[in-house]
């Protein structure tokens, strides 16, 4: 079982429950072969201001973004139990969900899954990598009872 530390650094109130987050992450782990020694994850729900600061500092991109992933970088010789950290801009997730005619819960599930896959080394820079990552997200979300997040 993974230990998830959830931090609330936003006034946004319609956040997913810890039990839902645990279910989403545990389901993702069923589809992936990963380091069995890793068992911790931090998710920080943030506002647009903090998201903008982090996005500009770490990705050199202006404005807020929905999710940022920070894989754990252990000190050599000291094994780490953490997969890393996710920073999720809750107000932006809600706005995107509304614009895409999705429930906020479905969009949070998608972005937590998406961010967690980044922590596991998946990316979407190249087209075939993006296709692999999206297909995995679709399978995980389907297992959780959510629709394909990429269909209009």
UniProtKB/Swiss-Prot annotation:
Q: What is its EC number?
A: 3.1.-.-
Where on the tree of life does the source sit, at the highest rank? Bacteria
- Group of enzyme by EC: hydrolase
Cofactor(s), names only, from the UniProt record: Zn(2+)
Q: Where in the cell is it found?
A: Cytoplasm
- Relay the cofactor remark from the entry: Binds 1 zinc ion.
Q: Which GO terms describe its cellular component?
A: cytoplasm
- Describe the function of this protein: Single strand-specific metallo-endoribonuclease involved in late-stage 70S ribosome quality control and in maturation of the 3' terminus of the 16S rRNA.
Q: Which PANTHER family match?
A: ENDORIBONUCLEASE YBEY, CHLOROPLASTIC
Q: Spell out the NCBIfam families in the cross-references.
A: rRNA maturation RNase YbeY (TIGR00043)
What is the protein name stated in its UniProt record? Endoribonuclease YbeY
Lineage at the top is: Bacteria, Pseudomonadati, Pseudomonadota, Gammaproteobacteria, Legionellales
